[in-house]
Structure formats: C-alpha cells, structure tokens
C-alpha cells in the first residue's frame, strides 16, 4: 500500500473512532451559542443549565451591590423561578376561577390600559385612586417593567410578567414606598405570598440599611410581612383591572392584608425628633 493509501486509511480509522465521541459530546451539550433553539415567544432567550446558574449568581451579586438595578432584579427573578416556583404560581392560578380568567385573557398593566387620568378621578379611597396617587407620589410609571425573556414556558413567562406588573398594586395597597427599606418589607411579604425565590433573596439587602433602618425593619416591617404574607390570599389571582372602583380598605380585609406601619410618617417623625435634639444640644452649648 502506498504512503498516501496508508495515510488515508489512518484518517478514516481516526474518523470512525472520533464519530461516537462527537455524538456523545452533542448529547451532553444540547446547544451552544452558535446552535441555540429558536425562541418560544417574542424576546425569549433560551439558556443552558450553566448559563442560567451564571445569570442567577451574577444578577444576585449585582443587585445586592445596587438594589436599584431593576434589570438585575428582574434577571434574578427569572433565573431562579424555574423549574419549580413559577410552575407552582401558574398552578395556583389554574386552581382559581379568577386566576384562570387572567391566564385566558392575559391582560397587561400599562398607563394606557389602566387609563391613569381616569383613575385620578375615582373616589379617594378606591383601589384605582390609591394606585394612581401612589404612582404620582413615588414618581414611577407602570410602563417601566422589564419584559420576561429567560423563562422557557410561554405561559409561565406570562405569569412572571403578570406578577411583575402587579408589583406596584401591592405597593399601593400596603402603602409601602419605593426606597430600599420599603422594598425590602414588600419583598418579604411577596416571598411568603408567592414563594418566588428572588423575593426572598432580596431580603439580604438589609445589610445595606443604616443601623436605625435595620432595627426598624426587623422589629416592625418584617413581623408585619410574616403575618400578612402567611395570612393573605394568593395575590396573583387578583384581577386588578376589575376592582379599580372598590374600596381599598374593604379589599385589604378580603385579601387578609394588614396595613403596615406608615414608613414615610415614621421617618418624618424621626427626622423631626433628631432636629429637636440637635437644636436642644446647640442651645446648651
């Protein structure tokens, strides 16, 4: 056999040996960045197990460093919601008549769908007016919520989107503000109500609170979150768009939500007390 013939035979044998290895490698790694399955809905980004883990760790660290990074908090929520927790929330909706209607209708919460100018004309203690007043006071908009993209199941992606867009209603009904102390209190409440891991992980941001804020969180608002979170009905099954004219006190009673201590008023009183104490000390000097 010629040299070229022997070389060709060797290459053929090597190819036969490597073929099973290549097949095994393909089975171990279902897809790569260059061979990714098509998205299952607009904006969907499929992730491998390791990519999802890296996203969870990176977004957790980043959001702890800067709790105002809504994009990182959103990514953390999606990366840690599967495979179990978002399905549990979806099943909670499927087991409830109103939840099933929400899944069928798939409403979206935006400034257009809610008609904010109309909400501002509703009675002062109505759900819609309370919501609009809270948005105006906090300077936020329902149009700023990130779209879900890292959850594979299309229906579960909507469930996460619904939770995300209802978050400001939870703020409005409880009266909790958007600064870190208020967000932590609401996240603790949401964790016990929804079991979404991100809401529980967010509580670790208490390390960024000042000593007085930390003491207040653990003595006042965390106990409130535990009581209300365990006692309240599944908030994901509230069809907010249909109860905008309802009395907010009546709604809290129906849902089993206790009104938390007014955080803004507490901070205001503490500032006044500190000011008086400072003036008293200056008067002595």
Swiss-Prot record:
User: Nucleotidyltransferase as a keyword?
Assistant: no
Which sites bind Zn(2+)?
Answer: 167-168, 171, 183
- What name goes with this protein? Ubiquinone biosynthesis protein coq4, mitochondrial
A single Gene Ontology CC annotation of this entry is: mitochondrion
Q: Which cofactor does it need?
A: Zn(2+)
Keyword Cell inner membrane listed:
no
Class of enzymatic activity (EC top level): lyase
Q: Which domain of life is it from?
A: Eukaryota
Instruction: Identify the EC number(s).
Output: 4.1.1.130
Oligomeric state and partners? Component of a multi-subunit COQ enzyme complex, composed of at least coq3, coq4, coq5, coq6, coq7 and coq9.
Q: Where in the cell does this protein reside?
A: Mitochondrion inner membrane
InterPro entries per UniProt: Coq4 (IPR007715), Coq4_euk (IPR027540)
Corresponding gene? Answer: coq4
Q: What's a Pfam family in this record?
A: Coq4
- Chief location category: mitochondrion
> Annotated pathway, please?
Cofactor biosynthesis; ubiquinone biosynthesis
């Amino acid at each position: 056999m010629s040299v070229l013939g022997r070389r060709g035979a060797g290459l053929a044998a090597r190819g036969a040996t490597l073929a099973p290895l290549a097949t095994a490698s393909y089975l171990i790694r279902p897809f790569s960045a260059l061979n990714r399955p098509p998205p299952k809905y607009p904006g969907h980004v499929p992730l491998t197990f390791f990519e999802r883990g890296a996203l969870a760790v990176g977004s957790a660290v980043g959001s702890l460093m800067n709790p105002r990074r809504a994009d990182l908090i959103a990514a953390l929520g999606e990366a840690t919601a599967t495979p179990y927790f978002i399905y549990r929330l979806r099943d909670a909706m499927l087991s409830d008549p109103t939840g099933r209607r929400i899944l069928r209708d798939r409403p979206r919460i935006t400034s257009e769908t809610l008609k904010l100018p109309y909400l501002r004309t509703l009675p002062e203690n109505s759900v819609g007016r309370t919501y609009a007043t809270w948005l105006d006071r906090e300077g936020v908009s329902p149009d700023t919520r990130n779209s879900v993209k890292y959850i594979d199941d299309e229906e579960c992606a909507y469930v996460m989107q619904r939770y995300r867009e209802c978050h400001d209603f939870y703020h409005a009904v409880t009266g909790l503000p958007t600064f870190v102390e208020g967000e932590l209190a609401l996240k603790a409440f949401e964790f016990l109500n929804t079991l979404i891991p991100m809401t529980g992980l967010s509580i670790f941001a208490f390390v960024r609170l000042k000593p007085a804020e930390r003491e207040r969180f653990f003595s006042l608002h965390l106990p409130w979150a535990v009581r209300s979170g365990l006692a309240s009905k599944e908030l994901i099954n509230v069809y907010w768009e249909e109860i905008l004219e309802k009395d907010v006190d009546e709604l809290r009673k129906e849902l089993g939500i206790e009104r938390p201590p007014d955080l803004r008023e507490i901070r205001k009183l503490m500032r006044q007390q500190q000011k008086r104490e400072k003036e008293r000390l200056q008067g002595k000097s």
